[in-house]
């Protein structure tokens, strides 16, 4: 007879491995399904300075490995597998994967959300080499340097404000002639002496040798191009939650995030959503870790009532 786990966690990022740690430590049989390696998007971050306990910071890959090891120390098992199909509505949840079919009484979805890329040549190869997607995560090394932020929404505006406090110069590049961000961001950005707006502009190329050295900007009205030197770029043109598997069964918001409140409970009993994949105000490593712990608290309640 195939094993039925108490909990299967889909995704091995900080939220997923925290859930696995808490579940395994509580004596629940726990399986983590991860298609790549520990850490998720966090593993791409060169330096994390805002996660407590590391006075000199830590890179995302190493932190992800440490989280995996902590969970496995208490008995959680990791299976490198991609999930192709899920059936979550029944009392026993079934997951079809590249490594076979797995069943569980509860499921924690920790599939995360990926930054939307600009789609210019060389972008993927430069990620982590002065090309970033999160100012709060990766901004600290740019103190006193020149950076660019691409985007015009709330995330881009927040990133530009964050960077303006540490960088010598911040270029905010937007394809329109005004910000889409809410008005609360406009005045602080306009008044920041080190923020310069590049209106009606898109990035047509990333200038680089082994690392980024600048951007090529294209005027959307005239087509004219110019080069802009910078030490780093922060791309903030939206995020895409990894929720394709769950569109049929789970309630999602208009942006595709799984609807779950601070309890992490979803629209299906026994199914929880944690980290960047769920509706929430702040998507950071530390809030993802919190979600993982909370999910196990409510999963234990659910299991006690549904054994």
Each model region followed by its residue ranges:
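Phosphate-coordination loops involved in phosphoryl transfer and adenosine-cofactor binding
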Residues: 4-6, 80, 143-145, 200, ...
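Beta1-alpha1 glycine-rich phosphate/pyrophosphate-binding loop at the start
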Residues: 5-74, 157-183, 253
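Glycine-rich, N-terminal phosphate-binding loop of Rossmann-like dinucleotide-binding domains
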Residues: 12, 111-112, 237-238
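A Rossmann-like FAD-binding core segment of flavoenzymes
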Residues: 71-96, 101-102, 164-262, 301-307
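Glycine/small-residue-rich loop that forms an oxyanion/phosphate-binding "nest" at active or ligand-binding sites
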Residues: 78-143, 147, 152
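FAD-site-proximal beta/loop scaffold in flavoenzymes
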Residues: 119, 124-141, 237-287, 291, ...
């Amino acid at each position: 007879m195939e094993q039925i786990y108490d909990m299967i966690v889909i995704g091995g990022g900080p939220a997923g491995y925290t859930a696995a740690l808490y579940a395994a430590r509580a004596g629940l049989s726990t399986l983590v399904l991860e298609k790549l390696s520990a850490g998720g998007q966090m593993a791409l971050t060169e330096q994390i300075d805002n996660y407590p306990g590391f006075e000199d910071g830590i890179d995302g890959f190493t932190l992800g490995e440490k989280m995996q090891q902590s969970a496995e120390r208490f008995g959680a098992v990791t299976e490198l597998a991609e999930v192709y199909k899920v059936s979550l509505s029944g009392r026993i949840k079934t997951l079809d994967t590249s490594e076979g079919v797995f069943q569980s009484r509860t499921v924690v979805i920790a599939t995360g959300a990926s930054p939307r890329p600009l789609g210019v040549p060389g972008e993927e190869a430069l990620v982590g080499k002065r090309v970033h997607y999160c100012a709060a995560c990766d901004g600290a090394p740019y103190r006193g340097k020149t950076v660019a932020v691409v985007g015009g929404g709330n995330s881009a505006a927040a990133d530009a404000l964050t960077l303006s406090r540490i960088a010598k110069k911040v270029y905010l590049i937007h394809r329109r002639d005004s910000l889409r961000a809410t008005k609360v961001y406009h005045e602080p950005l306009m008044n920041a002496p080190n923020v310069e707006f590049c209106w009606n502009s898109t990035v047509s190329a990333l200038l680089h040798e082994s690392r980024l050295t600048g951007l090529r900007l294209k005027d959307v009205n005239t087509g004219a191009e110019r080069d802009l030197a910078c030490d780093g770029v922060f791309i903030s043109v939206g995020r895409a939650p990894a929720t394709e598997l769950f569109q049929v069964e789970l309630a999602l918001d208009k942006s595709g995030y799984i609807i779950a409140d601070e309890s992490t409970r979803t629209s299906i009993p026994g199914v929880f959503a944690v980290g960047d994949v769920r509706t929430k105000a702040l998507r950071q490593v530390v809030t993802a870790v919190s979600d993982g712990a909370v999910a196990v608290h409510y999963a234990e309640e659910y299991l006690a009532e549904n054994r």
